[in-house]
Amino acid sequence: MKKKILILDDKETIAKVLSIYLMSDYDVQWLPDGLQGVKWLQAGNTPDLIISDIRMPGMRGDDFLEWIKQNELFRHIPVIMLSSEDSTSERNRLLEIGAVDYIVKPFNPMELKIRVKKILPQ
């Protein structure tokens, strides 16, 4: 059975690119913001990995990361953060909260796939 990845990004084009590169090896679900992600998790869904943009309307990705890492049921799920901002302080802040990786947009989709495979070995 394929491992499940949840993508949180308000840009559908980014989600589609990620899905194209990941769907051959993983079951991919896309939602447009962190609040939808919270609702999806609370409905009983548990992905093996979450890839989340930071800047989204509604619940931002950094707020979602804080929520998930404070929630006993979900804190074990690894989260990769995506950002258009190449900021050392932002990267360090998110890694301290509990992100397993921080990838700057634009990114190479193949590189992201390699990073995902390191986190979710098959």
Question: What annotation goes with each model-predicted range?
Answer:
Residues 107-116:
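C-terminal output helix
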Residues 12-29:
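Two-component/phosphorelay signaling modules centered on CheY-like receiver
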Residues 31-37, 91, 109:
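Conserved Asp/Asn-Gly motif in the active-site loop of CheY-like receiver
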Residues 32-49:
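Acidic, metal-coordinating helix/loop segments flanking the phosphotransfer/catalytic sites
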Residues 53, 83:
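Active-site residues of response regulator receiver
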Residues 15, 57-58, 66, 75, ...:
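The feature encodes the CheY-like receiver
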